[in-house]
Amino acid sequence: MALGTKHVLHLTKPSSRSSPLNIVIEPAVLFSILDHSTRKSENNQRVIGTLLGTRSEDGREIEIKSCFAVPHNESSEQVEVEMEYHRAMYHLHLKANPREVVVGWYATSPDLDAFSALIQNLYASPAEPGTAPLGTYPHPCVHLTVNTDVSSPLAIKTYVSSPVGITERLADSCAFVPTPFTIRDDEAVRSGLKAVAAPKNDPSRLASLFTDLQQLRRSTLELLSMIERVSDYVQNVIDGSSPANVAVGRYLMKCFSLIPCVEGQDFEKIFSSHLQDVLVVVYLANTLRTQVDIASRLNLLP
């Protein structure tokens, strides 16, 4: 018996193949989004933009490395996204970073509404025949939300989507599925974040760059401070003024086992020898740089 209605409700459960297991976000992306939010138009409640990055071969891990804002007009009735601007910026970005692709989009608002679903489907839709892809199809589209409201805590969330709704409303309907993410936190990033956060209490908000020797001195002082904290903790545990922690004790034993058993005088000789080698390498590198600079200037002479 044939049914007379043409309305079909689509309910697609997100599969493990279409949803990435993990999303890695570079801190520079979050700083860029916060910077974009300060230039928000008065007519719009949020800023949206394109997320760029790389995918693993199986598509189950996405690394978000950069982003750019995309102009749009949003009202209570409709939303207009300037996809030509998105196309031009993406092609310009490919000239500097040819390996990065579109992995999704971001918004400076935690709200998910029909317009969010419309933009999500726009980024996830396949390209027109004969044109270069500008979205994430056939891979899942990542939606990153950053709550930039100064009256609320900074909240970061990532989503992928699954189609849901009747046939006539598939373009502006989808179910956002939360996806786990991590923010990259390696040594280089941590050093940069410390330099950026250093002038947070300074009214001028100016951060000064340190020389290699100054940075070495700061790192040495931080290391001495951490050693003093560990020494005080161990002494307090021995005296019985602080409770013992088995996990901390095992971690300290593991760290101490990695330290070579060297006398103080021998260690000073080894360190001095290593420091002299480093200074020689730096001197030779500066000499070579000077020679190359002189040679390039001599080649310009008639």
Swiss-Prot record:
GO CC annotation: cytoplasm; cytosol; eukaryotic 43S preinitiation complex; eukaryotic 48S preinitiation complex; eukaryotic translation initiation factor 3 complex; eukaryotic translation initiation factor 3 complex, eIF3e; eukaryotic translation initiation factor 3 complex, eIF3m
Keyword annotations from UniProtKB, A to Z: Cytoplasm, Initiation factor, Phosphoprotein, Protein biosynthesis
Quaternary structure and partners: Component of the eukaryotic translation initiation factor 3 (eIF-3) complex. The eIF-3 complex appears to include tif32/eif3a, SPAC25G10.08/eif3b, tif33/eif3c, SPBC4C3.07/eif3f, tif35/eif3g and sum1/eif3i. This set of common subunits may also associate exclusively with either moe1/eif3d and int6/eif3e, or with SPAC821.05/eif3h and SPAC1751.03/eif3m. The eIF-3 complex may also include SPAC3A12.13c/eif3j.
Modified residues (Phosphoserine): 162
Localisation: Cytoplasm
Residue intervals of the MPN domain: 23-165
GO MF annotation: an example: translation initiation factor binding
InterPro entries recorded: eIF3f (IPR027531), EIF3F/CSN6-like_C (IPR024969), JAMM/MPN+_dom (IPR000555), MPN (IPR037518)
Family named by the database record: Belongs to the eIF-3 subunit F family.
Transmembrane residue ranges: none
One family name in Pfam for this protein: JAB
CDD domains xrefs: MPN_eIF3f (cd08064)
Entry protein name: Eukaryotic translation initiation factor 3 subunit F
